[in-house]
Amino acid sequence: KELKKYDVHIIGLDLKEDVIRKCNGLAEKYGYEKLHFLSGDIAEYEGVQKVDMVVTLHACDKATDYALAKAVEWDAQVILSVPCCQHELNDQIQNKLLSPVLKYGLLKERMSALLTDGIRAELLESKGYSTQILEFIDMEHTPKNLLIRAVKTGRSRSGEALKEMTDAIHGHLTLEKLLYPDGFDAKEGV
């Protein structure tokens, strides 16, 4: 079957076997021969070399970072990511200037979640993507309603302001380490 008159091949990954069985059953039931679901971790997935679009939906915590890094590795033209459970930065963030606010756990958690997604978007920009952060569904349906939309432009941006900020809050994401294994050079994108 074509999807909106496009000949597409879709691969879905999830760690939950029951979800994979159900999704493959639905794909078969409705005749989508080019839609396959596999049980596996995106960080270890090697089934393809080139991908046009990567979509993530509530990939918990660092799984979003691994998916975004894979998307960059695959030179995906479009990335649509709905992150979830941004705990990594919450455990790291420290800043004397912000300490009066960061002492409140709820505020620290929310600030960390928003900063995490902003940092992810900026890291994608440093790798040649134009990014936007959008609210894709009303808050009454789910509080996890942010979408990072990234479109490949090939024009990398400097990460100097990002590096200055992440150093100031003592927070560095897994995505940064995956995209820049030798260390984030803020001027690399220029």
Regions found by a protein language model. Name each.
Residues 1-5:
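Conserved SAM-binding loop of SAM-dependent methyltransferases across substrates and taxa
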